[in-house]
UniProtKB/Swiss-Prot annotation:
It comes from Schizosaccharomyces pombe (strain 972 / ATCC 24843). The keyword Nucleotide-binding applies. Pathway: Amino-acid biosynthesis; L-arginine biosynthesis; L-arginine from L-ornithine and carbamoyl phosphate: step 2/3. CDD domains: ASS. It catalyses: L-citrulline + L-aspartate + ATP = 2-(N(omega)-L-arginino)succinate + AMP + diphosphate + H(+). The gene is arg12. Homotetramer. The lineage of its organism: Eukaryota, Fungi, Dikarya, Ascomycota, Taphrinomycotina. Disruption phenotype: Causes arginine auxotrophy. Gene3D superfamilies: Argininosuccinate synthetase, chain A, domain 2, HUPs. Belongs to the argininosuccinate synthase family. Type 1 subfamily. It comes from the Eukaryota. Keywords: Amino-acid biosynthesis, Arginine biosynthesis, ATP-binding, Cytoplasm, Ligase, Nucleotide-binding. This is Argininosuccinate synthase. It is found in: Cytoplasm.
Length: 410
């Protein structure tokens, strides 16, 4: 009897690593379906498809996931003001659940028993992809070549891969390899490894792809306005026109931030594994969006609701996203809580951008009633009785007076 064919879906980029992994999987007896996810990165999709078929892929899927990516992870993260270790806006982390989910959907459609990826054995992405795989399809077989001795002992580095590619007739674009690795999507671009592994080294000017050097940005201030409904952007008004629809808004925010040098960071972060890693990130449009969103929350959200959201949702959602646990009960709970907090976040924020900086110029909301101009005014009482404050201060000071704490501070 003929042996049953083993079928696998490979997350394919068209680069040297995944092209060699494709050939190796075929060599190992797998029938491979290649899958490429368009999450907003620059890519010659037709050339990559042709390359995969030439190497031996049975079929190639090219999936446009940009709108799904923005709606399902980017906007919820922005509504929660999610940020990892106070600086990283999670651009890579946000894309991985969306990419992994479609890979599993294709695996089920094509009756594949396995999925594969080209992530290295030290990074975060292997964890993010595989936790998503197992959450969505617990019985799936995962092939991670860079963790298999049979693979990494054979292919110690780029030289071995190039020799294998030549032997297998895999077309390799002869370009000078940049001394760092990159990952790009509609939200950001990351740079790490190579020369960047020295945390004291200043990144070369030509590394940054998405934004101009702030010193080279225009000398004129550029203004824009972002409209929000329930914490999500619905309209962008700027000198280039009016834009609606999440993908259009993000592309335009990226264009504004790009020409004004907004959204660069250079950090050392803590990976899920405990290793420290140096990363340089450009997150242009999302940096502007987050600034506007946080400002509008100041006008529209009740103080204690915002404090609870900041302490529990913001911190924990960022950690969950970074650690690859998006498809978990915790995420559903956190997003449900955050959705309630965002019901009142409606309005418009006016901003300016200038040489790497984002500044809020004003905000307004037709539905928020927490801010009372007369009640807050220093020029009129507006219904506020100053004598109320005396009792408030007496009550608040009671525990301080009774604590005998003053002796430690005098």
């Amino acid at each position: 009897m003929p042996q049953e064919v083993k079928r696998c879906v490979l997350a394919y980029s068209g680069g040297l690593d995944t092209s060699c992994i494709l050939a190796w999987l075929i060599e190992e007896g797998w029938e491979v379906i290649c899958y490429m996810a368009n999450v907003g990165q620059e890519e010659d999709w037709d050339a990559a498809r042709e390359k995969a078929l030439k190497v031996g892929a049975k079929k190639v899927y090219v999936e446009d996931l940009r709108e799904e990516f923005i709606n399902d992870t980017v906007i919820p993260a922005a509504q929660a003001n999610a940020i990892y270790e106070n600086v990283y806006l999670l651009g890579t982390s946000l894309a991985r659940p969306i990419i992994a989910r479609r890979q599993i959907q294709i695996a089920e459609k094509e009756n594949c028993i396995a999925v594969s990826h080209g992530c290295t054995g030290k990074g975060n992405d292997q964890v993010r992809f595989e936790l998503a795989y197992y959450a969505l399809k617990p019985d799936v077989q995962v092939i991670a070549p860079w963790r298999l001795p049979v693979f990494f002992e054979r292919f110690a580095g780029r030289k071995d891969l190039l020799e294998y590619a030549a032997a297998k007739g895999i077309p390799v674009t002869q370009t000078t390899k940049k001394p760092w690795s990159m990952d790009e999507n509609i939200v950001h671009c990351s740079y790490e490894a190579g020369i960047l592994e020295d945390p004291s080294m200043t990144p070369p000017k030509d590394m940054w792809k998405l934004t101009v050097d702030p010193k080279d940005a225009p000398d004129e201030v550029e203004e824009l306005s972002i409209h929000f409904e329930k914490g999500a952007p619905t309209k962008l008004e700027c000198k280039d026109g009016t834009f609606s629809g999440v993908v259009s808004i993000f592309y335009q925010l990226n264009a504004i931030a790009r020409r004004n040098g907004v959204g660069r960071i250079d950090i050392v972060e803590n990976r899920f594994s405990g290793l420290k890693s140096r990363g340089c990130y450009e997150t242009p449009g999302l940096t502007i969006l987050r600034t506007a969103h946080m400002d509008l929350e100041g006008l529209t959200m009740e103080r204690e609701v915002r404090a609870l959201r900041d302490q529990f949702v913001t911190f924990n959602l960022a950690k969950i996203l970074y650690n690859g646990q998006f498809f978990s009960p915790c995420t559903r709970m956190l997003l449900a809580a955050n959705n309630v907090s965002q019901e009142v976040v409606n309005g418009v924020v006016k901003l300016s951008v200038y040489k790497g900086n984002v500044t809020v110029l004003g905000r307004k909301s037709d539905t928020a009633h927490l801010y009372d101009e007369k009640l807050s005014s220093m020029d009129e009482l507006g219904g506020f009785d100053p004598t109320w404050t005396s009792g408030f201060i007496q009550i608040e000071s009671m525990r301080l007076r009774n604590s005998d704490e003053g002796k430690h501070w005098m």
